[in-house]
């Protein structure tokens, strides 16, 4: 019978090397095996090319059966929530992407309450995550919290509309807002830059909190630092979306064909589509971390405070009931004591009368 050889643990050849440097590789393998989850919300008026842009970003068709409503249907139309989930795999890395669309936003004549449905949806996802996180089985929690919101701004105005301001202020403490100027091919380069500056000025004027890209670390390479600088300078992103392949300069590109030429979707000289996609991919982890550490924690703290106040009120009510019961008990004891005293006086009075009557006889 052969003797089994013991497992060999070999000392690293490099002096002073323990092996901790391999830990990131372990995390990477585990993350790749598990896959990634990301939820993107798109909000904006109809006709701004939201669906086309999302399909262009992820090279997929998320809305194959969508029916475009007519003008008459839009008059009384209410905001709906449509969540579409698709599994995307690229070089062995899986991404579970959920895109939350909001058809009907801004379509009705009276848009005063049109964003309440959207806010309720965001809060519901926080509430669901809090419930799952507090449960017994926390191993397979699906994260449907909204990590980023692309807010589409019309290129045909002179800046932000009152509805834009009201909506962004209503959600800026709940989700990461990335402002996007839609249909940038309707603007000249000068008009585009002027509109960007106007929007940024109004965002600052109304104290709207949009998503700010983190600064590049000092140890990052110069190319990444330059990329981060260009991405920051491009906000709000002015984009063009198209799923059509056309021929330009002897090659097939996605773009739009006009009598005066071709607008290429993925040409950074024509629009900010590539910059927007680069921002989303390179900062996807940061968007999730800000959602977890800032927006979700704010919701969780407020939720626990409300729960704490409820418990506190219940305790106060219980204390009040006990005090009232104790006061009622004291009143009854005092009443019984008075009755006993009266009965004792009556008995003493009766005994004295009987004694006087006996002496008289």
Swiss-Prot record:
Enumerate the residue ranges of region (Important for dimerization).
260-270
List the residue ranges of the region (G1 motif).
44-51
Q: Which domain of life is it from?
A: Eukaryota
Alphabetical keyword list? Acetylation, Cell cycle, Cell division, Cell membrane, Cell projection, Centromere, Chromosome, Cilium, Cytoplasm, Cytoskeleton, Differentiation, Flagellum, GTP-binding, Kinetochore, Membrane, Mitosis, Nucleotide-binding, Phosphoprotein, Spermatogenesis
Please give the family membership noted in the entry: Belongs to the TRAFAC class TrmE-Era-EngA-EngB-Septin-like GTPase superfamily. Septin GTPase family.
Q: What does this protein do, in the record's words? A: Filament-forming cytoskeletal GTPase. Forms a filamentous structure with SEPTIN12, SEPTIN6, SEPTIN2 and probably SEPTIN4 at the sperm annulus which is required for the structural integrity and motility of the sperm tail during postmeiotic differentiation. Required for normal organization of the actin cytoskeleton. Plays a role in the biogenesis of polarized columnar-shaped epithelium by maintaining polyglutamylated microtubules, thus facilitating efficient vesicle transport, and by impeding MAP4 binding to tubulin. Required for the progression through mitosis.
What is the protein name stated in its UniProt record? Septin-2
């Amino acid at each position: 019978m052969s003797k089994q050889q013991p497992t060999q643990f070999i000392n690293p050849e490099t002096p002073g090397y323990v092996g901790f440097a391999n830990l990131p590789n372990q995390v990477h393998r585990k993350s790749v095996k598990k896959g990634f989850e990301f939820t993107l919300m798109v909000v904006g008026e109809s006709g701004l090319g939201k669906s086309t842009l999302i399909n262009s970003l992820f090279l997929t068709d998320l809305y194959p059966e969508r029916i475009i409503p007519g003008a008459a249907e839009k008059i009384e139309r209410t905001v709906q929530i449509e969540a579409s989930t698709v599994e995307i795999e690229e070089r062995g890395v899986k991404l579970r992407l959920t895109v939350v669309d909001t058809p009907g936003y801004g379509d009705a004549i009276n848009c005063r309450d049109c964003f309440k449905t959207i806010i309720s949806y965001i809060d519901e996802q926080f509430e669901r995550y809090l419930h799952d996180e507090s449960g017994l089985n926390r191993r397979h929690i699906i994260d449907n919290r909204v990590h980023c919101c692309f807010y589409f701004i019309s290129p045909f105005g002179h800046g932000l509309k009152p509805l834009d301001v009201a909506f962004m202020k209503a959600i800026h403490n709940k989700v990461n807002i990335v402002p996007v100027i839609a249909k940038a091919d309707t603007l000249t380069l000068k008009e585009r830059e002027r509109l960007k500056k106007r929007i940024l000025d109004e965002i600052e004027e109304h104290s709207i909190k949009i998503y700010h890209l983190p600064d590049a670390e000092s140890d990052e390479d110069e190319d990444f630092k330059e990329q981060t600088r260009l991405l920051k300078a491009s906000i709000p992103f002015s984009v063009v979306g198209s799923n059509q392949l056309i021929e330009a300069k002897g090659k097939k590109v996605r773009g739009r064909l006009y009598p005066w030429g071709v607008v290429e979707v993925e040409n950074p000289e024509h629009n900010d589509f590539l910059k927007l996609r680069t921002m989303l991919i390179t900062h996807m982890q940061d968007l999730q971390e800000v959602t977890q550490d800032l927006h979700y924690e704010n919701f969780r703290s407020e939720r626990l405070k409300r729960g704490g106040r409820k418990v506190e009120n219940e305790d106060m009510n219980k204390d009040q009931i006990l005090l009232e019961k104790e006061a009622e008990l004291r009143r009854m004891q005092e009443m019984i004591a008075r009755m006993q005293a009266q009965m004792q006086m009556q008995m003493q009075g009766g005994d004295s009368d009987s004694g006087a009557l006996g002496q008289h006889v």
